């Protein structure tokens, strides 16, 4: 009888320890499925595992840059599935918020609504614009990339022309990564 009691006690203790370990590993530690990354090198290294290629740090003439990753969950076991490089770019004495986003999943269904800007190396690049923002996006090897700029008010025409060329060149840089 003592041997059976010891086995039952051991099974109960293992179940408790297993429950604690599972809770620690799966307890949400990120308030959102996104986390900040300290450096470009860390971002690039983390994203290599996903197959999503990160363009060079100077793909846009950033004044200041922030890096973050979108995660597939909120717990300790979450893995990166997308990245965001964001910051300000200055033109004509004004600062414009810019973002470059790359994801391993095509979850962006705007290609039917947005006009095609051009095909670059057999990759369609789409462009959408409003008075205070401009968006370019493309899909290559199943990965989606978006590059966008925002203004505080209506963008002057010279800024529109500048960012039109700048964002398109950033898209070309992304496509060239896969060549």
Describe the role of every protein-language-model region.
Residues 3-4, 14, 81, 93, ...:
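Residue-level detector of intrinsically disordered, flexible termini
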Residues 108-179:
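A short, solvent-exposed beta-edge/loop patch
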């Amino acid at each position: 009888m003592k041997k059976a009691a010891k086995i039952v006690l051991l099974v109960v203790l293992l179940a408790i320890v297993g429950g604690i370990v599972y809770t620690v590993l799966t307890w949400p530690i990120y308030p959102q499925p996104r986390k900040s990354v300290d450096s470009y090198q860390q971002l690039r290294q983390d994203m290599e595992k996903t197959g999503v290629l990160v363009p060079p740090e100077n793909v846009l003439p950033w004044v200041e840059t922030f890096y973050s990753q979108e995660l597939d969950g909120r717990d300790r076991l979450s893995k990166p599935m997308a990245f965001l490089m964001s910051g300000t770019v200055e033109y004509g004495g004004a600062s414009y918020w810019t973002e470059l986003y790359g994801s391993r999943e095509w979850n962006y269904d705007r290609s039917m609504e947005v006009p095609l800007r051009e095909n670059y190396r057999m990759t369609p690049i789409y462009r959408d614009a409003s008075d205070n923002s401009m968006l370019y996006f493309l899909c290559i090897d199943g990965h989606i990339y978006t590059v966008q700029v925002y203004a505080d008010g209506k963008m002057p025409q010279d800024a529109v022309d500048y960012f039109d060329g700048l964002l398109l060149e950033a898209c070309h840089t992304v496509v060239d990564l896969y060549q």
